[in-house]
């Protein structure tokens, strides 16, 4: 299973809304688009059109990860996921694992601490240790669902990423730029600014001197 960025967002939204707003689930295309474009609890924030969401939905339907549902007497088609925990799904996840996968689909790589803080509407973890235990279970499967990313400079915890989407495989495993390199780059930039300003001031002073000389010559010719 490999999801595009848009497909991962659609699945993540359906998983989330099934738990947090069950009275509104399944979702219409309009509701699903609004969920995909939320400004909060989404990373990155997207601005998908209904057409783009429909394309993702149609693709997921072909992959048998979404099903359509029409209410009696209503023409509005609504969508529900078949990603996990349904009679048609091979994938069965515990509530804790579902919460972690959902958050990673919606918000990208996160630390165990971030997952615990952000999961309260999906699942209540007692502590970070419980989150870490669940992460290990998801990583130790025959086909892992998560992987650990190299720890970034300045972070106490490593981040984890889901392995269902194509975007996760594009993440660089290399460490980010070293702090010394960053500081050096900033120092060069700061040094460059005064040099540019000094050059500009010198040019202006030269122009003023030339104008003053011409003015003096003009006054002399008139006297």
Curated annotation (Swiss-Prot):
Coiled-coil portions: none
Pfam families listed in its UniProt record: DUF480 (PF04337)
SUPFAM superfamilies, per database record: Winged helix' DNA-binding domain (SSF46785)
HAMAP family documented for this protein: UPF0502
Family: Belongs to the UPF0502 family.
Protein name (database record): UPF0502 protein Sbal223_2520
Taxonomic lineage: Bacteria, Pseudomonadati, Pseudomonadota, Gammaproteobacteria, Alteromonadales
């Amino acid at each position: 299973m490999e999801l595009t960025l848009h497909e991962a967002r659609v699945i993540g939204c359906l998983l989330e809304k099934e738990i947090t707003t069950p009275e509104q689930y399944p979702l219409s295309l309009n509701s699903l688009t609004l969920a995909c474009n939320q400004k909060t609890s989404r990373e990155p924030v997207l601005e998908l059109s209904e057409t783009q969401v429909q394309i993702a939905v149609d693709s997921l339907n072909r992959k048998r990860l979404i099903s359509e549902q029409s209410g009696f007497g209503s023409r509005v088609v609504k969508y529900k996921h078949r990603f996990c925990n349904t009679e048609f799904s091979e994938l069965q996840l515990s509530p804790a694992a579902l919460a972690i996968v959902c958050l990673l689909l919606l918000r990208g790589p996160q630390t165990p601490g971030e997952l615990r803080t952000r999961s309260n509407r999906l699942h209540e973890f007692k502590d970070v240790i419980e989150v870490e235990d669940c992460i290990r279970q998801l990583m130790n499967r025959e086909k892992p669902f998560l992987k650990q990313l190299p720890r970034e400079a300045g972070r106490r915890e490593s981040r984890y990423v889901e392995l269902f989407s194509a975007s996760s495989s594009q993440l660089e495993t290399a460490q980010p730029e070293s702090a010394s390199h960053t500081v050096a780059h900033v120092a060069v930039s700061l040094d460059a600014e005064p040099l540019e300003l000094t050059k500009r001031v010198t040019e202006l002073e030269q122009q003023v001197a030339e104008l003053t000389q011409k003015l003096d010559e003009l006054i002399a010719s008139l006297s």
